[in-house]
Amino acid sequence: MMKKDRAQKSTTREYIMKLIYQININKEDFETLEDKVDNFLKDNSEHIINRYKELALQYSKNTNLKLEDTEIEDVIDKKYINTVCKALKENHDKIDELINKHAKNWTVDRMPKVDVSILRLSVCEILYLDTPNKVSINEAVELAKIYCDDKSPKFINGILGSVVDEIGK
């Protein structure tokens, strides 16, 4: 069961990052984040379920994993999404300030939007969720390897490491 939970958490994290990205490129306010979740999940449910299945198989040693009847409710951690949305809505300015402070010679306005989305999610986790810092940083770096250019994983890792050092968690 543990591997399924890991696949669920990774899938959820990946798609909340995509929602943050969508809000960023559409120049929408984080006040609307919670309102957009259900439509975003519904519109992307097939992709989300397929990604979950891919990760569940990748993380599992069980080659007979039963995934045929997988529903969106099985693959998304709604509680995690709601917690992230609430924290981002209430604290996005503080999160961006922290990112700007630790991104030497960069600001969130000048960084690639995907990098910013990954950083916002990870800093949010580090500050406001019970996710272990190492897990949050590792997941952010893994997302950067998939969605960003070659320099981004190191860049993101450096910023997040610096944030963790500052807050002393």
Swiss-Prot record:
Coiled coil: none annotated. GO terms for molecular function: RNA binding. The keyword Heme does not apply. InterPro entries: NusB-like_sf, NusB_fam, NusB_RsmB_TIM44. Keywords: RNA-binding, Transcription, Transcription antitermination, Transcription regulation. One of its GO terms (biological process) is DNA-templated transcription termination. One of its GO terms (cellular component) is cytosol. The keyword Transcription regulation applies. It comes from the Bacteria. Belongs to the NusB family. Involved in transcription antitermination. Required for transcription of ribosomal RNA (rRNA) genes. Binds specifically to the boxA antiterminator sequence of the ribosomal RNA (rrn) operons. This is Transcription antitermination protein NusB. The gene is nusB.
